């Protein structure tokens, strides 16, 4: 084929012998400026290329490609394509790992990519700064103890169930599945259905109708809940992956991050949270779900968070990996000890991180209505 102009070496026993063949002729092969690998175009050939690359400097390797319909040089020779073999040899490209891509290779997919749809939050003030939330993102919601994180998350769950056709998965580690359903049905009925006295005055038929409207769909379950006792990192990650892949769930809520850490008590909290956040990020990228994560705060000097103290990213409990790996971090601030009931029940929404638009700061206020068990958008009370 090359008329003796170029050195040609063969593997003694096919692709499986690549390592031994190279070792036996290493000094000779390594003496050349570059080496063209012309292995079979199949899985065994690809593995042989990977093994050969490990044994030489990557910049020395070029990969020969075959025309469509031909597996190797033998196929081309039998078809009489001698000139074409020479062309393939001269056109061999320098080896490049699959995860390193030239920008020009991305042009077509860049131009033809589908529009990334956003889902709006239930509150206009939050949408103004964030432009909603999207699949493939991880949003962390944080506040002090007893500040209404679960109420905000429940409103988000209800919003997803009623305003999108998507399936929702929830992992509430501090409450029973019964309490989760009570909360969502209560939002639907605009009453605190989790309270005994409220359930007593609600007709069973009304509650059942609300349940059916929320959770029954022709396509299957609208809501899937985690009802396990195990809190280990691996268990929670496996359940999120199962929800996404086996049940086609698009949105998952994990409430809360720090309780998962209590199930993996080995090692220090910071490293455990780093490990969990990294795995959560990997699952989000792998499955393209939208993930909401609830996180607690560390105690700080100055005004306590429970008395309205301002929150910053450095207050996130345990690890800065929470802030670094989240697409969005939303803080809830409230003075739950205020003597003024209006102030006591008003939550400030503060964006601490916003990878999508870059806008941060106070974005609005939510007022809790105990009679309806709902959070509604409001203006800042004069007393705050």
What is the predicted role of each segment?
Residues 1-109:
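TOPRIM fold recognition
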Residues 42-44, 68-70, 174-178, 230-232, ...:
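Conserved nucleotide-binding/hydrolysis micro-motifs of P-loop NTPases
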Residues 97-191:
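The Walker A/P-loop phosphate-binding site
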Residues 196-201, 224-230, 261-274, 304-314:
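Flexible beta-alpha connector loops of hexameric P-loop NTPases
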Residues 242, 249-291:
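Helical hairpin unit composed of two closely spaced alpha helices linked by a short loop
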């Amino acid at each position: 084929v090359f008329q003796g102009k170029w050195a040609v070496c063969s593997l003694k026993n096919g692709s499986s012998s690549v390592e031994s063949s190279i070792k036996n002729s290493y000094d000779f092969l390594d003496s050349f400026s570059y080496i063209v690998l012309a292995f079979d175009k199949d899985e065994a050939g690809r593995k042989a290329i990977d093994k050969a690359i490990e044994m030489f400097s990557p910049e020395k390797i070029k990969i020969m490609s075959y025309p469509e319909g031909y597996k190797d040089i033998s196929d081309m020779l039998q078809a009489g394509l001698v000139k074409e073999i020479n062309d393939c040899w001269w056109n061999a490209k320098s080896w490049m790992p699959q995860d390193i891509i030239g920008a020009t290779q991305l042009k077509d997919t860049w131009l033809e990519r589908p529009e990334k749809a956003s889902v709006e939050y239930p509150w206009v003030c939050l949408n103004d700064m964030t432009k909603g939330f999207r699949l493939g993102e991880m949003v962390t919601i944080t506040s002090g103890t007893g500040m209404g994180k679960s109420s905000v998350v429940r409103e988000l769950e209800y919003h997803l169930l009623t305003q999108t056709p998507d399936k929702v998965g929830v992992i509430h580690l501090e409450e029973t599945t019964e309490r989760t359903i009570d909360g969502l049905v209560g939002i639907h009925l605009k009453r605190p259905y989790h309270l005994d006295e409220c359930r007593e005055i609600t007709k069973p038929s009304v509650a059942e109708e609300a349940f059916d409207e929320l959770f029954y769909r022709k396509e299957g379950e609208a809501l899937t809940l985690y009802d396990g006792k195990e809190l280990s990192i691996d268990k929670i990650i496996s359940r999120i992956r199962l929800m996404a892949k086996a049940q086609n769930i698009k949105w998952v809520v994990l409430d809360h991050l720090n309780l998962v850490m209590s199930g993996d008590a080995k090692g220090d909290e910071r490293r455990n949270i780093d490990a969990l956040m990294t795995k959560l990020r990997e699952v989000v990228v792998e499955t393209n779900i939208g993930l909401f994560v609830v996180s607690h705060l560390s105690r700080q000097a100055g005004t306590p968070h429970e008395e309205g103290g301002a929150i910053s990213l450095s207050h996130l409990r345990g690890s800065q990996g929470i802030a670094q790996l989240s697409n969005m971090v939303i803080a809830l601030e409230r003075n739950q000890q205020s003597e003024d009931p209006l102030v006591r029940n008003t939550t400030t929404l503060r964006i601490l991180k916003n990878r999508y638009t870059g806008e941060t700061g106070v974005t609005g206020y939510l007022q809790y209505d105990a009679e309806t068990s709902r959070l509604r958008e409001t203006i800042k009370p004069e007393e705050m």
